[in-house]
Amino acid sequence: MRAVGVFLAICLVTIFVLPTWGNWAYPCCHVTQLRAQHLLALENISDIYLVSNQTCDGFSLASLNSPKNGSNQLVISRCANGLNVVSFFISILKRSSSALTGHLRELLTTLETLYGSFSVEDLFGANLNRYAWHRGG
């Protein structure tokens, strides 16, 4: 009977805890100004998680992830200004808007909505020291 309880506990952890581990468990990160050798090359970025400004005290953040040395394991993660990331993708998608597929048009609309949700009032109400820019190595 004890083995069944342990098995159920492991299953519950697998179902409910592991999917939220990593970026989703702690979506708010510190934006750090990095030296050039520590930046992620654009072609190496595998995932980008955008975090709404309502989630992180008025700050729009993004987590840029890359596998290390071609492995499937996500090792390298960088925090970025979410508004800059969203603006970059909006700019790229608008340049070729006539050739966009339905999914890319939907992405453009979603990004524009996210960008439009940012307000100066959110920034003034934010704890400016919480996600401050840090000079990193």
Swiss-Prot record:
Presence of the UniProt keyword Repeat in the record: no
GO cellular component: host cell Golgi apparatus; host cell plasma membrane; membrane; viral envelope; virion membrane
Membrane protein topology class: Peripheral membrane protein
Positions of region (Interaction with gH): 23-128
BP-aspect Gene Ontology terms: fusion of virus membrane with host plasma membrane; symbiont entry into host cell
Signal peptide (from-to): 1-22
Family per record: Belongs to the herpesviridae glycoprotein L family.
Protein's recorded name: Envelope glycoprotein L
